[in-house]
């Protein structure tokens, strides 16, 4: 359960990172 939770957090961070990269690229 803890491992799955950590993996979800990592995936969420990747999505946020990709979104930030897209915003920065547009700027």
Curated annotation (Swiss-Prot):
Its main location: periplasm. One of its GO terms (cellular component) is periplasmic flagellum. Keywords: Bacterial flagellum, Periplasm. It comes from the Bacteria. It is found in: Periplasmic flagellum; Periplasm. The flagellum consists of an outer layer composed of repeating units of FlaA around a core that contains one or all of five antigenically related polypeptides. Component of the core of the flagella. Belongs to the bacterial flagellin family. This is Flagellar filament 31.5 kDa core protein. It comes from Spirochaeta aurantia.
């Amino acid at each position: 359960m803890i491992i799955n939770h950590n993996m979800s957090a990592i995936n969420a961070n990747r999505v946020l990172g990709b979104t930030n990269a897209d915003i920065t690229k547009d700027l």
